[in-house]
């Protein structure tokens, strides 16, 4: 009438009923194992995704240790010479050898480095060659007083427009794209750095270790205009910054400063 399974079930039931403590701890262990297994699986996936994302952001934002300071100087505006911000120009250490090669080729030996950069044609050719060879750079802007991003953007755009070729629709489109992607609705506090970095073909804007915007810099047009604004021609945005940069570039060109 009753099979083997029935007697086995009855035996186990009677045996466990006399040992309630064992039943309790077995249940706790089972539940605990279930609880631990599920979060560990989710945590592992989340951690992997987070680390991958942070690694990509790290390359675009927190790569100051890969950068080398070329020079710095103050930016003054208006006939009153109001000191509005300090600028620092950086390149990646791995690009120093490339810079050396290009300067050796492009600088007019009769003029020297400084006068070559002051010559509109030669200086523009040097900057174009550096960008064509994928030199990556960063501009660090440190305001001397509280300001807003709208005011900074206006100054940057006017500087870019002053360097544009006449009737060049591609440059006009690039400057318009910069204007539309640069944030305006926030404050840039005194002595708090705003970075603008060229990463690949992306021109990124970084503030307080967060990317606040970027644009695709087609053919490095915006980068070219920015660098010319600080380095090329008889008048630049900061003569002291250009002098500082040229001192370093001269050492790189001479081979006395190589990594």
From Swiss-Prot:
Pfam families: Chalcone_2. Disulfide bonds: none annotated. GO terms for molecular function: heme binding. InterPro entries: Chalcone_isomerase, Chalcone_isomerase_3-sand, Chalcone_isomerase_sf. Gene3D superfamilies: 3.50.70.10. One of its GO terms (cellular component) is mitochondrial inner membrane. This is Uncharacterized protein C18G6.01c.
């Amino acid at each position: 009438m009753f099979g083997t399974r029935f007697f086995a079930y009855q035996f186990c039931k009677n045996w466990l009923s006399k040992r309630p403590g064992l039943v309790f701890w077995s249940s706790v262990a089972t539940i605990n194992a279930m609880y631990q297994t599920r979060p560990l699986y989710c945590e592992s996936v989340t951690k992997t995704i987070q680390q991958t994302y942070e690694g990509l952001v790290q390359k675009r934002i927190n790569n100051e240790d890969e950068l080398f300071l070329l020079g710095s100087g103050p930016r003054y505006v208006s006939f009153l010479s109001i000191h509005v911000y300090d600028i620092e120009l950086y390149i990646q250490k791995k690009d120093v050898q490339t810079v050396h090669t290009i300067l050796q080729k492009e600088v007019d030996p009769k003029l020297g480095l400084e006068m070559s950069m002051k010559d509109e044609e030669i200086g523009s050719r040097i900057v174009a060659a550096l960008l064509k060879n994928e030199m990556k750079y960063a501009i660090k802007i440190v305001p001397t007083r509280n300001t807003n991003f709208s005011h900074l953007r206006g100054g940057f755009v006017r500087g870019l427009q002053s360097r544009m070729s006449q009737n060049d629709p591609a440059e006009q489109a690039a400057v318009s794209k910069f204007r539309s992607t640069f944030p305006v609705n926030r404050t840039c506090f005194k002595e708090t750095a705003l970075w603008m970095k060229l990463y690949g073909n992306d021109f990124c804007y970084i503030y307080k270790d967060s990317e606040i915007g970027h644009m695709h810099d087609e053919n490095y047009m915006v980068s070219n205009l920015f660098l010319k604004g600080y380095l090329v021609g008889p008048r630049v945005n900061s003569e002291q910054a250009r002098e500082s940069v040229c001192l370093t570039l001269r050492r790189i060109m001479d081979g006395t400063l190589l990594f």
